[in-house]
Amino acid sequence: MSNRHLPIGTRDEFGPRAIRKENLIQTISQQFIQAGFERVKTPLLEYRDVFKPLAVSGEQPYQMLDDAGESVVMRPDLTLPLARLLSTTSIVPPVQWWYVGDIFRVKKSLSGTYNQITQAGIELIGYRSLKAEWACLSEAGKICRTLGLTHLTLELSDAQFVPQILRTLQLNDAAADAFQTAFFAKELSTYQNLIAPLATNPLYPFLQQWPWLFGDSETIFAELKRLLPSNVITDRLAPLQQTVAFLKDQFPELRVTIDLTSRPPQSYYTGIFFHAYVDGGHQYLFSGGRYDKLLASFQQELLPAVGLAFDIDAVTDQLPNAPDQPLTFVYGLPSQWQAAAAMVATTPNARLCLVDTLAEAQAAATKQHANLIDLSPKEAIL
């Protein structure tokens, strides 16, 4: 194995992109702090069992053994460690936390994606109110507005919509599993065969249209009102409708869509979930939702929770570089160190020229197309 190559799925970060990424992290962190969230940080290494509830198709964590022979992993997720933290300490919810850190997932070769991803997000644990979802979405909207991210589409869904329809259809477990598999995989011919025996069911017109129920929120709600009984709309869809109204009031620049055909990101999601992307983008800029089963793997008492996570790398790629400013070198004699440092502090894009002679300083400035500020009265023997 070469010592000159990086492992597949990793990269070095430097230059303008690294600066954009670091500035972005600072911007998001300050937003969370100003909103009253408390900082939380968990270890990079966790026991493998912490992530049992995590289901990410085609991805595996980096895994190793500790000195006791226990399986530990580099965290593939930042939410479950917070559930572990809450269940093993005397912290009393509700809590409002914010975090920033890297996650690691070994993805398929040639997938074109990276195994190391930086995330920044918030967790509101102990809140049942729909206001918790709104708080997450509000923070996300304000951050995107601050960053100047326009042409943003926010897609909303509900983790319990499919289960509720299946319960209404009164399918047995085997039939329900087959139905969900075909539906989420978009296997339309199989799906049509599965709904054919339900032709006399009052929901059959809805079932025929269901695979295409995604898009503009007003259009989808109008279709649902036409196709579904009123009690389903009231019970399951009212929170979605209220959330769409909230977003249109608070963030009229957002394009809000509904997708009632998508699988929840994880099995522990229990309500509204969401993600956002820009036109032409191939990655979600942020995502999140409600997961009231978050603590199911750690304790019997379940706690309501809502979370939001920004993909820092995806957002970084959407941000422009800062306007180019010419580099300036400041050169001075050793006795002028303090004066040179003061000049650097007050000169845009300046740095100390760490060479011994004026000739070397001039050569360095020429090589990097930089300006040169010479503080030395004359060349001297050092």
Swiss-Prot record:
Keyword Amino-acid biosynthesis part of the UniProt annotation: yes
Compartments, as annotated in UniProt: Cytoplasm
Any one GO CC term of the record: cytoplasm
Keywords noted in UniProt: Amino-acid biosynthesis, Cytoplasm, Histidine biosynthesis
Chief location of this protein within or outside the cell: cytoplasm
Keyword Amino-acid biosynthesis carried by entry: yes
Pathway noted in the entry: Amino-acid biosynthesis; L-histidine biosynthesis; L-histidine from 5-phospho-alpha-D-ribose 1-diphosphate: step 1/9
One GO biological process term: L-histidine biosynthetic process
Function as written in the Swiss-Prot or TrEMBL entry: Required for the first step of histidine biosynthesis. May allow the feedback regulation of ATP phosphoribosyltransferase activity by histidine.
Note: This function is generally fulfilled by the C-terminal part of HisG, which is missing in some bacteria such as this one.
Name of the protein in question: ATP phosphoribosyltransferase regulatory subunit
Species assigned in the record: Lacticaseibacillus casei (strain BL23)
Gene: hisZ
